[in-house]
């Protein structure tokens, strides 16, 4: 991969987008961004607070702006929020400006990876986490599939192993 094209990681919460993104950026010597962290940095508040105050729609509006700005950069790895694909504008931007990699995981692995995480606003409800994750998968998985250039199952692999798999895929391009 002579030219450093943008790499965008999409997938559900708990798929490993941020962890794998950091690994990938280190191995490829590319700059790493996490859209959720960027929103937190710009607002000075955590994602849960933004959700509480502005609602999901307000958060998603911020997300569109951040994704638009970040994807204009060259040679970056971007870990997106799990719901970023809900907005057609984000899907179009991601598809047009880089290589989109769908990090796929099972509901069981998501439950395991997120069980102690209190920073995920969609899991802070009276509905069981399994039900929430199943509903999100039903809504979002087709959207991930729609824009993915590649799909990688992350369940039984380390972040480093997934990063190497991605690099191998990119070298074949």
Swiss-Prot record:
UniProt entry keywords in alphabetical sequence: Amino-acid biosynthesis, Aromatic amino acid biosynthesis, ATP-binding, Cytoplasm, Kinase, Magnesium, Metal-binding, Nucleotide-binding, Transferase
Subcellular location: Cytoplasm
Catalytic activity: shikimate + ATP = 3-phosphoshikimate + ADP + H(+)
One GO cellular component, as annotated: cytosol
EC number annotated for this UniProt entry: 2.7.1.71
GO biological process entries: amino acid biosynthetic process; aromatic amino acid family biosynthetic process; chorismate biosynthetic process
Binding positions for ATP per the UniProt entry: 14-19, 120, 157
InterPro entries, per the entry: P-loop_NTPase, Shikimate/glucono_kinase, Shikimate_kinase/TSH1, Shikimate_kinase_CS
Entry binding sites for Mg(2+): 18
Pfam families: SKI
PROSITE patterns the record matches: SHIKIMATE_KINASE
Cofactor binding summary note: Binds 1 Mg(2+) ion per subunit.
Names of required cofactors: Mg(2+)
The protein's annotated pathway: Metabolic intermediate biosynthesis; chorismate biosynthesis; chorismate from D-erythrose 4-phosphate and phosphoenolpyruvate: step 5/7
GO molecular function, one term: shikimate kinase activity
SUPFAM superfamilies: P-loop containing nucleoside triphosphate hydrolases (SSF52540)
Binding site for substrate: 36, 60, 82, 140
Subunit structure of this chain's protein: Monomer.
Stated family: Belongs to the shikimate kinase family.
Functional description taken from the UniProt entry: Catalyzes the specific phosphorylation of the 3-hydroxyl group of shikimic acid using ATP as a cosubstrate.
Protein name (database record): Shikimate kinase
Source organism per UniProt: Buchnera aphidicola subsp. Schizaphis graminum (strain Sg)
Gene giving rise to this polypeptide: aroK
């Amino acid at each position: 991969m002579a030219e450093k094209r943008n790499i965008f990681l999409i997938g559900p919460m708990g798929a490993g987008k941020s962890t794998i993104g950091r690994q990938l950026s280190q191995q490829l010597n590319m700059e790493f961004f996490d859209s959720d962290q960027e929103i937190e940095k710009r607002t000075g508040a955590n994602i849960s607070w933004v959700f509480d105050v502005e609602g999901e729609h307000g958060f998603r509006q911020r997300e569109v702006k951040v994704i638009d700005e970040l994807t204009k950069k060259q040679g970056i790895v971007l870990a997106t929020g799990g719901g970023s694909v809900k907005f057609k504008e984000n899907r179009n931007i991601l598809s047009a400006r880089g290589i989109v990699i769908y990090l796929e995981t099972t509901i069981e692995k998501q439950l395991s990876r997120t069980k102690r995480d209190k920073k995920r606003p969609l899991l802070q409800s009276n509905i069981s986490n399994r039900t929430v994750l199943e509903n999100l998968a039903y809504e979002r998985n087709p959207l991930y599939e729609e824009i993915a250039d590649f799909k990688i199952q992350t369940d039984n692999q380390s972040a480093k192993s997934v990063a190497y798999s991605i690099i191998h895929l990119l070298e074949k391009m």
